[in-house]
Amino acid sequence: IDWLNTPNKPYSPSISDYRIEKERNRNFLEFPLNTVKTKVSYDKDYLPRYVNLAFNKGVLREGLEEFFRENDTLVSITHPFEVVKDFFVDSNQKSHPLLSFKRQSVIDNLEDILILARRLNREIEFLKVSDIISTYTNE
């Protein structure tokens, strides 16, 4: 599935193509997992990746700054196995360039988000999906 042209923010999807936005529809709102530009050692160029708090410290920083300049809502994803060292099994590497497999990375990345928000004069608020929906449908 090609999501490259999909909005990187909550949107009302078109009936003919759910990946593109149509006029505001109070009946349906899509909350995509947000992507930011990232680059790690094995990447030739920057790539859009889902915002994952289990990434190594610093991987998200530049992309998040760009994202927060244009967006108010961030939807991230983290899988439980990505923060447990025992799940990293690669005989060729001592560490993974992208995923940390450490719980501390979640804290580090959240702290980076808080620092960035303060620098950009943004408020941080953790919301339930129902709160986000009411915010977007009552604009």
Residues covered by each model-derived region:
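C-terminal domain-boundary segment and adjacent tail
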Residues: 50-139
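Active-site-adjacent pocket scaffolds in enzyme catalytic domains
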Residues: 1-72
